[in-house]
């Protein structure tokens, strides 16, 4: 480090570890077809002020360590002048609000996108009576219901983040859908966030299949 280079305000060792964790998991999700056409974004809490997050516009199945950048909880790049996803604020608002959240995953599977369109009018999908509801942290029985919010899509992330915050003031959430877009899910760590993501995917798929079998919407 020369005299004009300031030290980085985060651990590069920890960033290296998280980059490998993110890349390995993202590659699996990409191979499942949940991140088409460079879509989707993924992050992990780095420390009390920073998050590691995927850069914008990269094929998520072919990420390398240089494609993982650092942002502060205002969504601003730290360390390297890279461009984070336009949806970075939807990640950082969760880290800022909930110190226990360690990982946020955003995917665009066909199931998630179709469900978000079908239920956009009601603004919510009610998942009830499924054994897999126990996959969500804190749930211990199938005799419960989880409501998945469906927010209108917008390119104004400040507006969308405010809408998410307002709903978080009223209810517990493990994730939400954006109309015609995809799913956000989170957890205390990568394993929990993936469990929540996979549970949502399975349960939404079940709901769509039930609609087809019933011949109703």
From Swiss-Prot:
Transmembrane segments: none annotated. GO terms for molecular function: methylthioribulose 1-phosphate dehydratase activity; zinc ion binding. Pathway: Amino-acid biosynthesis; L-methionine biosynthesis via salvage pathway; L-methionine from S-methyl-5-thio-alpha-D-ribose 1-phosphate: step 2/6. It holds the Pfam family Aldolase_II. Its cofactor is Zn(2+). It catalyses: 5-(methylsulfanyl)-D-ribulose 1-phosphate = 5-methylsulfanyl-2,3-dioxopentyl phosphate + H2O. GO terms for biological process: L-methionine salvage from methylthioadenosine; monosaccharide metabolic process. Keywords: Amino-acid biosynthesis, Lyase, Metal-binding, Methionine biosynthesis, Zinc. Binds 1 zinc ion per subunit. Catalyzes the dehydration of methylthioribulose-1-phosphate (MTRu-1-P) into 2,3-diketo-5-methylthiopentyl-1-phosphate (DK-MTP-1-P). SMART domains: Aldolase_II. InterPro entries: Aldolase_II/adducin_N, Aldolase_II/adducin_N_sf, MethylthioRu-1-P_deHdtase_MtnB. It comes from Xanthomonas euvesicatoria pv. vesicatoria (strain 85-10). It comes from the Bacteria. GO terms for cellular component: cytoplasm. Zn(2+) binds at residues 106, 108. This is Methylthioribulose-1-phosphate dehydratase. Belongs to the aldolase class II family. MtnB subfamily. Its EC number is 4.2.1.109. The keyword Chaperone does not apply. The keyword Translocase does not apply.
């Amino acid at each position: 480090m020369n005299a004009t280079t300031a030290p980085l305000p985060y651990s590069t060792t920890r960033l290296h570890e998280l980059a490998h964790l993110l890349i390995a998991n993202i590659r699996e999700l990409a191979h499942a077809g949940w991140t088409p056409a460079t879509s989707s974004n993924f992050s992990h809490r780095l420390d009390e002020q920073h998050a590691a997050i995927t850069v914008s516009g990269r094929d998520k199945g072919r990420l390398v360590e240089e494609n993982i950048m650092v942002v502060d909880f205002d969504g601003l790049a730290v360390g390297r002048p890279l461009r984070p996803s336009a949806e970075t604020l939807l990640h950082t608002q969760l880290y800022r609000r909930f110190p226990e959240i360690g990982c946020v995953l955003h995917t665009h599977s066909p199931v998630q996108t179709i469900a978000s369109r079908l239920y956009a009018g009601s603004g919510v999908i009610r998942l009830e009576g499924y054994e897999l509801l126990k996959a969500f942290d804190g749930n211990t029985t199938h005799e419960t219901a989880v409501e998945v919010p469906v927010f209108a899509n917008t390119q104004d992330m400040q507006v969308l983040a405010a809408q998410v915050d307002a709903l978080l003031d009223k209810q517990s959430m493990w994730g939400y859908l954006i109309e015609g877009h995809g799913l956000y899910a989170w957890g205390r760590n990568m394993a929990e966030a993936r469990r929540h993501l996979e549970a949502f995917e399975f349960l939404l798929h079940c709901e769509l299949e039930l609609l087809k079998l019933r011949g109703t919407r």
